UniProtKB/Swiss-Prot annotation:
Belongs to the intron maturase 2 family. MatK subfamily. This is Maturase K. It holds the Pfam family MatK_N. Usually encoded in the trnK tRNA gene intron. Probably assists in splicing its own and other chloroplast group II introns. The lineage of its organism: Eukaryota, Viridiplantae, Streptophyta, Embryophyta, Tracheophyta. HAMAP family: MatK (MF_01390). The keyword Transmembrane does not apply. GO terms for cellular component: chloroplast. It comes from Capsella bursa-pastoris. GO terms for molecular function: RNA binding. One of its GO terms (biological process) is mRNA processing. Keywords: Chloroplast, mRNA processing, Plastid, RNA-binding, tRNA processing. It is found in: Plastid, Chloroplast.
Length: 504
């Protein structure tokens, strides 16, 4: 990046176009396809999520394709001829897939420069588990215990393509880039409607950029209003993108909001609101009354419907009182548990009892949802009874055993922070018996005869897997004690929950 400052500077009047280097510059291809850009993005992985490139995507082919699209009668490709038109040995569907990859590379460069400039002069804390979803659990365990009301919001995604285009319009000043972006999206949807059995032709990197831009637009407005409506200024959210007419729209929104609903704005002022977002959902936690959460619910519905032109039903925003309801978040069912504690105090000759209530965050395992997932993957039936994994019988015995051990170990690590381990033991039992039935089916034997022939040493891998991990954390004497099964152990190395087989 430092070697080509003139080709990456987008602030000049002559270089406002995001696609300007894609049309006219050659150095951007070398930079984008080189591993140097990947190394830069990995260093900035705290704000960008990037995927690797496929070697079959050539930036030179993309440039020739764009030049061909500008020729006469080449701009619109009929849907019925999508699989028939060919260019350089590829079908027309492959064109849009390559364009989506290169488009994501181009638009990420100026955004990464803006984000990098916002962090200049600020010391960032180094963390070795930036991708860990478990890093949120200590926060939930420390903070949610002091709150009593949580607003659970399902973030809607726009179903119309123009909403995504309009969202990018506030950041992208170039009209030609937006028209080109709109053209690719509509061609993709036309092809998808033509053949719904095919998988998506757009690159995951491109789809991830669309989703992040949509969520960033929503969160920037939310945090801006949250900061203005609070007695104390929030400092946790530091990155805000620059957009055209953003502050003018916010002032207009405030003007309409204050004039029409003067009493509601005062009710939104609460400095003790915590915001967490994960996988298309977000929660707002507070220790105030449910009346405040009702006002925030009303705010979310109007924000999505008025600002983003999305039909957002109020049923997608749930108000949970942790003392009564369970909060389903991050694969756990969380609630507040009241533990009464009686303390005897004696002062001189008088003694009296003091009743104290201790509040703990009770995190349970959603056993029904996990059994449903295991049944969907043919590990058991819908009732939780283990069955053999027929698709794995062609593998070797060691491969089958290692797969089951990895799944069981990762589930044990993920749900080790649960306050009740009974459901975790049930899941382990299902996986162990499923492993035995799979091996017995492969060797054309019954489960009893198979276990009798091999002995109990077959299942030692399931039992010693946790021993090797926990012995690195606790002394052997502490591990041998029964207190370990009543302690919450948060593992900070689990990245994917669904990809249990491939995670090492």
């Amino acid at each position: 990046m430092e070697k080509f400052p003139g080709y990456l500077e987008f602030d000049g009047a002559r270089q406002q176009s995001f696609l300007y280097p894609l049309f006219f510059r050659e150095y951007i291809y070398v930079l984008a396809y080189d591993h140097g850009l990947n190394r830069l993005n990995r260093n900035r992985s705290f704000f960008l999520e990037n995927t690797d490139y496929d070697k079959k995507y050539s930036s030179l082919i993309v440039k020739r394709l764009i030049l061909r699209m500008y020729e006469q009668n080449r701009l619109i490709i009929p849907t019925k001829d999508l699989n028939q038109n060919s260019f350089l040995g590829h079908t027309s569907l492959f064109y849009y897939q390559m364009i989506s990859v290169l488009f994501a590379v181009i638009v990420e460069i100026p955004f990464s420069k803006r984000l990098g400039s916002s962090f200049q002069g600020k010391q960032l804390k180094k963390s070795y588990n930036l991708q860990s979803i478990h890093s949120i659990f200590p926060f939930l365990e420390d903070k949610l215990a002091h709150f009593n009301c949580v607003l659970d919001v399902l973030i809607p995604y726009p179903i119309h393509l123009e909403i995504l285009v309009q969202t990018l319009r506030y950041r992208v000043k170039d009209a030609s880039s937006l028209h080109f972006f709109r053209f690719c999206l509509y061609e993709y949807c036309n092809w998808k409607n033509f053949d719904k059995k095919k998988k998506s032709i757009l690159n995951p990197r491109f789809l991830l950029f669309l989703y992040n831009s949509h969520v960033c637009e929503y969160e920037s407005i939310f945090f801006f209003l949250r900061k203005r409506s609070s007695h104390f200024r929030s400092t946790s959210y530091q990155v805000l993108f620059e957009r055209i007419l953003f502050y003018g729209k916010i002032q207009h929104f405030f003007k309409v909001f204050v004039n029409n609903f003067p009493a509601i704005l005062g009710l939104l002022k609460d400095p003790f609101i915590h915001y967490v977002r994960y996988h298309g959902r977000c929660i707002l936690a507070t220790k105030d009354t449910p009346l405040l959460m009702n006002k925030w619910k009303y705010y979310f519905v109007n924000l999505w419907q008025c600002y983003f032109s999305l039909w957002f039903q109020s049923q997608k925003v749930n108000i949970n009182q942790l003392s009564k309801d369970n909060l389903e978040f991050l694969g756990y069912l969380s609630s507040l548990r009241l533990n009464p504690l009686v303390v005897r105090s004696q002062m001189l000759e008088n003694s009296f009892l003091i009743d104290n209530v201790r509040i703990n965050l009770d995190s349970k395992i959603p056993i029904s949802a996990i059994i449903g997932s295991l049944a969907k993957d043919k590990f058991c039936n819908v009732l939780g009874h283990p069955i053999s994994k027929a698709t794995w019988t062609d593998s070797s015995d060691s491969d089958i055993l290692n797969r089951f051990v990895r799944i069981c170990r990762n589930i044990s690590h993920y749900y080790s922070g649960s306050s009740k381990k009974k459901n975790l033991y049930r899941i382990k039992y299902i996986l162990r018996l499923c492993c035995v039935k799979t091996l017995a089916r492969k060797h054309k034997s019954t489960v009893r005869a198979f276990l009798k022939r091999l002995g109990s040493g077959l299942l030692e891998e399931f039992l010693t897997g946790e021993d090797q991990v926990l012995s690195l954390i606790f002394p052997r004497s502490y591990y041998a004690s029964k207190r370990l099964y009543r302690v919450r152990i948060w593992y900070l190395d689990i990245i994917y929950l669904n990809d249990l087989v491939n995670h090492e």
